[in-house]
Swiss-Prot record:
Involved in the biogenesis of the 60S ribosomal subunit. May act as a specificity factor that binds precursor rRNAs and tethers the enzymes that carry out the early 5' to 3' exonucleolytic reactions that generate the mature rRNAs. Keywords: Nucleus, Ribosome biogenesis, RNA-binding. The lineage of its organism: Eukaryota, Fungi, Dikarya, Ascomycota, Saccharomycotina. It is found in: Nucleus, Nucleolus. It comes from the Eukaryota. Belongs to the universal ribosomal protein uL30 family. Coiled coil: none annotated. GO terms for cellular component: cytosolic large ribosomal subunit; nucleolus. This is Ribosome biogenesis protein RLP7. GO terms for molecular function: RNA binding; structural constituent of ribosome. InterPro entries: Ribo_uL30_ferredoxin-like_sf, Ribosomal_uL30, Ribosomal_uL30_CS, Ribosomal_uL30_euk_arc, Ribosomal_uL30_ferredoxin-like. It holds the Pfam family Ribosomal_L30. One of its GO terms (biological process) is maturation of LSU-rRNA from tricistronic rRNA transcript (SSU-rRNA, 5.8S rRNA, LSU-rRNA).
């Protein structure tokens, strides 16, 4: 005797719709992958003007020369042949609409910085040494940020990648806003086959991963980062780099105008210097986080 299908009609309809949705998503992903391959091939065969090649070559050579000067001075400083030369320039908006600059010597004390990756000099390719430093800082993508403890050893590294980053001293409110809104981690839950990237909104995950360090909740992570406590490195590397929003996006005429204004402001705030002892420029990172968070 044949067995009747006892599944309700609604359940069968849901299964059918779920299967159709899954197939449609797979087809859309396949079309996106094919489109990316076509775009990649088109970029490889794209016509490049001679002026663009010359500009890119000159800009890249200037960057290589700058990094060689910075690295050579750092080596002399480690050997004791050169002293001093580590300067910080704090740039703030003035009341009259201009910029105030305050230049101070770095005293070697540990200082908490928030470092944001930005686009480098126009037309220049990133030299290999600068790329290695950016990878070490986990700043492989533009508009990502990490917390860094500035020390005498880290200062030369930030000088190497100065055109590609924006640095500043974050306040406790900015640290809390970043961690609560943008914190992501890689974690493997019980029963999962592999670790997955997830938003950090569970204190149980924090206690499981950092409980041995005395860190059991998100507020403990914020405290360790703000005070640069003993578990600062563990908490910092537990968090993935913060993915920030774009201040200007799109390709409309207004967006292009805003990008030009943004580039002009960046050139005034953070002028690129090819000097070996160029100071490290600090900006109002709290205001920057408020715009991008």
């Amino acid at each position: 005797m044949a067995t009747l299908n006892s599944n309700p009609e609604i359940l069968l309809r849901k299964r059918r719709n779920a299967e159709r949705t899954r197939v449609e998503k797979q087809e859309a992903a396949r079309r996106r992958a094919e489109a990316e391959v076509r775009q990649r091939r088109a970029r490889q065969h794209k016509f490049v003007r001679a002026e663009a090649l010359v500009a890119s070559t000159l800009a890249t050579e200037r960057e290589k020369t700058r990094i060689q000067r910075v690295s050579k001075r750092a080596a002399k400083q480690r050997a004791g042949h050169v002293t001093g030369g580590e300067w910080l320039v704090r740039v703030r908006a003035a009341a009259d609409g201009g910029l105030e600059r305050e230049k101070t010597a770095y005293d070697g004390r540990a200082t908490l910085l928030f470092v944001v990756r930005v686009r480098g000099p126009a037309a220049a390719k990133i030299p290999r040494k600068a790329h290695r430093v950016l990878t070490l800082l986990r700043l492989a993508e533009v508009n990502t940020g990490v917390f860094v403890r500035l020390t005498a050893e880290v200062f030369p590294l930030l000088q190497v990648v100065a055109p590609y980053v924006v640095v500043g001293r974050p306040s406790l409110a900015s640290i809390r806003a970043l961690v609560q809104k943008r914190a992501r981690v890689v974690h493997q839950r019980a029963g999962e086959a592999a670790p997955v990237e997830m938003v950090l909104n569970d204190n149980g995950v924090v206690e499981e991963r950092l409980g041995d360090e005395g860190v059991i909740c998100v507020e403990d992570i914020i405290h360790e980062i703000a005070t640069m406590g003993e578990a600062f490195a563990k908490c910092n590397f537990f968090l993935l780099p913060f993915k920030l929003g774009r201040e200007v996006s799109g390709f409309s005429a207004l967006s292009r105008l805003q990008k030009l204004k943004q580039r002009e402001e960046a050139s005034q705030t953070r002028p690129v210097s090819n000097a070996a002892a160029a100071p490290l420029v600090e900006v109002d990172v709290d205001e920057l986080i408020g715009r991008l968070n």
